[in-house]
Swiss-Prot record:
Pfam families: Cupin_1 (PF00190). Residues 1-22 form the signal peptide. The gene is LEB4. Belongs to the 11S seed storage protein (globulins) family. This is Legumin type B.
Length: 484
């Protein structure tokens, strides 16, 4: 009888402890969103590369910890190549400026781009095999690009101007089975750390590990001696010896040493002399192929067949005026990319919104029902107001190009462009089907008598509140005054 009793007691204690830990963890997560003040954030860290610049926001900002995300802004010079990398956190990229090509390596997908045999060259007595690789996609200004968790990708600027992109890493996403620390794994090169704040935390844990008694280190000294050469380089291959890599890839020792990139000082964006030579159809041909693929995807959907990851569309342009979901000729326009328009976002559980406000244009008070949002100013200037559940304005300031503002879930927000120029901004959202509720629409959907008693209004005032003015969320003050 004692053994079953002890087993039951142990199980009860385990469940109780797990519940307490889960409750404590959930409390800590929720406590991070108790924001009495929100700040407009700008990049905190810069990494200069041979052919570009990488800027990151400190992930320890309370606003970013609340949203559970990290952000990177990259500037890639013409002929610049951002080296292959991946992250345990899904990424959503917006192209602010320029154009280029991107390549993803999707597991289990065929290498559908093949070099014709007629183009193969001879080197001495040996024939060079024609190249083949997975599909390469073009992108341009205004594109949203979805990168799934753990999928390696590279980016190349084939344009004449710098390529500027901002990336959101959803570190709190269910796909990330690690902690909320932003991590970027580079397959090649010797890149500088992009989030130095997280490196400091990792170094502290490393020092704690080395402070353990000798008996608990498990042959650590021997491992340190064997991996002395592995201390150079910051790519994932830098952690393996040249000899091991030579055996693994069946290559020469010199090639294996280059794979480790121990003395490469170019960082994560390198210059490609003479331009990148890849197999890629011309722009018009590629557009025709994408239209055909889109048609096939539509037919598969009607037949009840799911898309495979190999055929999923990863980009969509949301900055074109004709793409607008909401439009007011005097106030501005709003375009949305979610899992309904770009199905791959269903796996990332992310979405985006592009807003263009003309001079003095207003995006009326609204809130995100099921998502945190991050507002990044692309161009222009304006004013943003955010109100919390206590009715306090936690943010009421001017915003300018390059600034980031976090809007927590259900906090009411309103934006207005300045008098001198418009306001153009992107909103990342932590839900693939983020829903928005507008205060104005709520009033129109509420019975008049409810509003009269709630606000102490006369019937005429209620009618004016419900029916006058613009019926959409985009408002221009002058047109509103004329309608009244």
């Amino acid at each position: 009888m004692s053994k079953p009793f002890l087993s039951l007691l142990s199980l009860s204690l385990l469940l109780f402890t797990s519940t307490c830990l889960a409750t404590s963890s959930e409390f800590d997560r929720l406590n991070q969103c108790r924001l009495d003040n929100i700040n407009a954030l700008e990049p905190d860290h810069r990494v200069e590369s041979e052919a570009g610049l990488t800027e990151t926001w400190n992930p320890n900002h309370p606003e970013l910890r609340c949203a559970g995300v990290s952000l990177i802004r990259r500037t890639i010079d013409p002929n610049g190549l951002h080296l292959p990398s991946y992250s345990p956190s899904p990424q959503l990229i917006y192209i602010i400026q320029g154009k280029g090509v991107i390549g993803l390596t999707l597991p289990g997908c065929p290498q559908t781009y093949q070099e014709p045999r007629s183009s193969q060259s001879r080197q001495g007595s040996r024939q060079q095999q024609p190249d083949s690789h997975q599909k390469i996609r073009r992108f341009r200004k205004g594109d949203i690009i979805a990168i799934p968790s753990g999928i390696p990708y590279w980016t190349y600027n084939n344009g004449d101007e710098p390529l500027v992109a901002i990336s959101l890493l959803d570190t709190s996403n269910i796909a990330n089975q690690l902690d909320s620390t932003p991590r970027v794994f580079y397959l090649v090169g010797n890149p500088e750390v992009e989030f130095p704040e997280t490196q400091e935390e990792q170094q502290e844990r490393h020092q704690q590990k080395h402070s353990l008694p000798v008996g608990r280190r498990g042959g650590q000294h021997q491992q340190e001696e064997e991996s002395e050469e592995q201390k150079d380089g910051n790519s994932v291959l830098s952690g393996f010896s040249s000899e091991f890599l030579a055996h693994t890839f069946n290559t020469e020792e010199d090639t294996a040493k280059r794979l480790r990139s121990p003395r490469d000082k170019r960082n994560q964006i390198v210059r490609v002399e003479g331009g990148l030579r890849i197999i890629n159809p011309e722009g018009q041909q590629e557009e025709e192929e994408e239209e055909e693929e889109e048609k096939q995807r539509s037919e598969q959907g009607r037949n009840g067949l799911e898309e495979t990851i190999c055929s999923l569309k990863i980009r969509e342009n949301i900055a074109q005026p004709a793409r607008a979901d909401l439009y007011n000729p005097r106030a501005g326009s709003i375009s949305t990319a979610n899992s309904l328009t770009l199905p791959i976002l269903r796996y990332l559980r992310l979405s985006a919104e592009y807003v263009r406000l003309y001079r003095n244009g207003i995006y009326a008070p609204h809130w995100n029902i099921n998502a945190n949002s991050l507002l990044y100013v692309i161009r222009g200037e304006g004013r943003v107001r955010i109100v919390n559940s206590q009715g306090n304005a936690v943010f009421d300031n001017k915003v300018t190009k390059g600034q980031l503002v976090v809007v927590p879930q259900n906090f009411v927000v309103a934006e207005q462009a300045g008098e001198e120029e418009g306001l153009e901004y992107l909103v990342f959202k932590t839900n693939d089907r983020a829903a928005v509720s507008h205060v104005q629409q709520v009033f129109r959907a509420t019975p008049a008598d409810v509003l009269a008693n709630a606000f102490g209004l006369r019937q005429r005032q209620v009618t004016e509140l419900k029916l006058s003015g613009n019926r959409g969320p985009l408002v221009h003050p002058q047109s509103q005054s004329q309608s009244n």
